Design a protein with these regions (language model features):
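General marker for long, soluble alpha-helical cores
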Residues: 1-140
């Protein structure tokens, strides 16, 4: 991933920007994945990715860019996620843990010390807590 972003960001390499790109890394930083997606108008295929790390905003942005064609990120949906935030909104956690807009994998939220939101949304977050396995939060 780093080499791809370096190549696209280099002033010495010309005429890049419309290519389809395949990410071979199994662990990626969501911010880096979003940067790569912004560098090209082609499809970024991330089907080899098994773990995504980063802030909740960056991770949700990666999943929001999910599509199978055009300027999008393809192949996401069942990755493990390791969040790096200490403070988040409950609604953003719910978005990430929704199969249609986030991951069905395990979400490591162990760095989070403050979750803000309504009682109903907080209940939804804690209802998504799992002790092991996938499709839920760990570390809460």
């Amino acid at each position: 991933m780093a080499a791809l972003n370096t190549a696209f960001g280099s002033e010495g390499i010309k005429n890049l920007g419309g290519e389809a790109v395949t990410v071979n890394d199994t662990t990626v930083d969501a911010g880096d994945l979003n940067i790569l997606n912004n560098y090209t108008s082609g499809l970024v295929t991330a089907s080899n990715v098994t773990t995504i790390t980063g802030t909740l905003a960056d991770v949700n942005a990666s999943y929001a860019a999910s599509a199978t064609s055009g300027n999008a990120i393809a192949g996401l949906g069942d990755e493990s996620v390791e969040l790096t935030d200490t403070r988040v909104l409950a609604t953003d956690l719910v978005t990430l843990n929704t199969d249609s807009s986030g991951t069905s994998g395990t979400i490591d939220a162990s760095t989070i010390s403050v979750i803000e939101g309504t009682a109903a949304t907080l209940n939804t977050v804690y209802d998504g807590k799992v002790s092991a396995g996938s499709n839920g939060f760990t570390g809460l």
